[in-house]
């Protein structure tokens, strides 16, 4: 199915690209989320008329994401307290939700889907660098310090 993308989508394309995708992906994901429209003549003409408006909207989103990333970088570090054994092994683990909640408690709203843990959940005490993907093009790195509960 031929579609016109209304947003940048990883591994697919950017604004205005006409791509061929499977019809189920288009009907179940792209169309409901407003990320694409079918590539009909009428939609192509409508898109060409709205292109500047959509590009301005995406630029505004990028500026807002950069501002959030700057706030996150200003935080520098977040400390989490968890129960741990003698050798620093945690009883349980610290995942994306725990990190997102801790950052949000400090004052910068972060969704758990934005937190990137490349090595999986944190299972020991120490300092860890965690990436926060605030936008597809903007990421911020924050230091997470995990200490044992006294």
From Swiss-Prot:
- Superkingdom as given in the UniProt entry: Bacteria
One of the record's GO molecular function terms? rRNA binding
Write down any Gene Ontology CC term.
Answer: ribosome
Q: Which UniProt keywords apply?
A: Ribonucleoprotein, Ribosomal protein, RNA-binding, rRNA-binding
- Name this protein carries in UniProt: Large ribosomal subunit protein bL9
- One GO-annotated biological process of the protein: translation
- Role: Binds to the 23S rRNA.
Organism name: Pseudoalteromonas translucida (strain TAC 125)
Encoding gene, per UniProt annotation: rplI
Family membership noted in the UniProt record: Belongs to the bacterial ribosomal protein bL9 family.
Q: Where is the chain membrane-spanning?
A: none
InterPro entries linked to this entry: Ribosomal_bL9, Ribosomal_bL9/RNase_H1_N, Ribosomal_bL9_bac/chp, Ribosomal_bL9_C, Ribosomal_bL9_C_sf, Ribosomal_bL9_N, Ribosomal_bL9_N_sf
PANTHER family linked to this entry: 50S RIBOSOMAL PROTEIN L9 (PTHR21368)
